[in-house]
Structure formats: structure tokens, C-alpha cells
Amino acid sequence: MIGCISPIFWGLSVSLVRTLSETLGVGKGLAINYLIALVFVFLLFGIPNLKAMPLKYYICGLGCAIGTSMTFAFSLGLAKDGTQTMEVGMINYLWPTLTILFAVLFNGQKAKWWVGIGMLLAIYGIFVVLSGNLLIDFKAMWSHIKSNPISYFLALWAAIFWAAYSNFTRAWAKGQNPTTLIFALDTIFFNAIWLLDLAPSYPWNTKGVLFAVGSALIMGSAYGMWTFGVQKGRIEIMSIMSYFTPVLSCIFASLLIGAKLTHEFWVGVSIVVLGSFICWAAT
């Protein structure tokens, strides 16, 4: 149950990261965000037993976690406006589908054959979002992607990295919660980007600081609860619950970053959610 709360917080993450990028800059905003979050998750979860986790988990599991942070942040930071931010965010929301796929292929999760139908529906929903057409206008979809290919490409890799992290954690973390370690590494990475001036940085402002604090608490809680859930709970149920994250994300985006979402966009999101019920029935 604890792990199932995290998708609610994930729904806020797209708008929060985008706002931080606009108010303080990707490097500066997320450096402060992860520094505060590091203190929070340390008090909440402490330090894991580093000797208990095998080397392969440090390389693969933590590597994927850091990869997620980098690709997710820059995919949103490079988006041109609120609407494109949500398009990029929807690509990132392929991670629930990929989490189930990886669990079936590599972690011994059992599923009925029609789980594939649910996964295809989720992918179809993403295509509808990107093309703006129920019949999938590949030309329009390609035009969207071509306008900012790096942003869309990074979003896809963020989805792949997070799905892999979830399954590596389930298989190899030995019951340890590495959230504090992950946030420590993220803090180092984003502070390096800020201090080395590798990304645009904006003057300090009240809105940016408030969002950094709020985002830190939300992201820290989401990471920790998700990691606890994939270790102790049923990863397939958590993945299904996470299918509702796109709906929450769209609602928050409309309120926080002024994203203008079309009817076709909402239909595409609804199709993604429909895929969740089919996957639920199959697992």
C-alpha cells in the first residue's frame, strides 16, 4: 500500500521539475532540490547496509537510478513550453508498461497472454498524444519529435532506466533501501552542473525556493515509498496503480504550468489508463 502512494507524487514531478527549470535553472534548481531531499530521506530512511548489496546492483541498479534522474530532468528542462513538457512527460510514462514487461521477462513475474494487449494500448495512447489524432498521424508525430528530438529521446530513456531500476532493486538490493545513496549521488551530479555552469541558471527568487523545498519533500517521499514497495510489495500491482499517474500529471500541469491539453491528448491519456485495467486482469 505504501508503494502505491508514490504514483500520486510522481504525478506532481513533471510540473515541479519544469517549474524549477524555469525559475532557477535545471542545474541550480535541482541541486537545491536534491540537497534538501537528501537530508529528508536520510532522516526518513537512514543509510543502507552498503556491504549487503552486491557489486552488480551498484553498477546496474544505481546506474539506472542516476540515469533516470539525469534524463528525466533534462528532457523536461529542454521542452519548449508547457504543452511540449506534457508530451515529453507522457513518453516518460511508458515506464509502468516497461516495468511489467521487464518483470515478466527477467524477474519471473507470471502474466496472462493478454497483458500484451494492455501494453500495446498504453503505447497506442502515447502515439495518440504525440500525433494528436486517434488514427495516429505518423507525419504529425514525427514533426513533434523532430522539433525537439533530444527532449523526447531523453524522456524515453528515463522510462527505460526507471523500469530497469525497479526490477534490479527487486532482484538484487537484498532488502536494502538505497534511496539516500541515490539522492546523495544526484546531489553531487546536479551541484556539479550548477557550479560548472553547464546549464542556464537564474537569480534566486521566492517561487523557485518554495518549489525546490516542496519538490524535495515530494520526490524524496516518492522515491523512498516506491523502492520500499518494489522490495516488499507486489510490483505488478504498483505498476498498475502507476498507470493513473498520467491523469494526475495532466491535472497538475494544467494548474501549475499552464499546459494547454487538447481533447485528443486527454483521449490518449485515457487509453493509457484503459491499458492498465487490461494489464491488471492479466497479472
Identify the function of each model-found stretch.
Residues 1-2, 27-44, 55-59, 118-124, ...:
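Hydrophobic alpha-helical transmembrane segments of multi-pass integral membrane proteins
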Residues 1-28, 137-171, 217:
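Glycine-/small-residue-enriched transmembrane alpha-helix faces in small-molecule transporters
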Residues 15-23, 77-81, 130-147, 194-212, ...:
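Membrane-interface helix termini and inter-helical loops of multi-pass transporters
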Residues 41, 60, 111-134, 243, ...:
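Hydrophobic transmembrane alpha-helices of multi-pass small-molecule transport proteins
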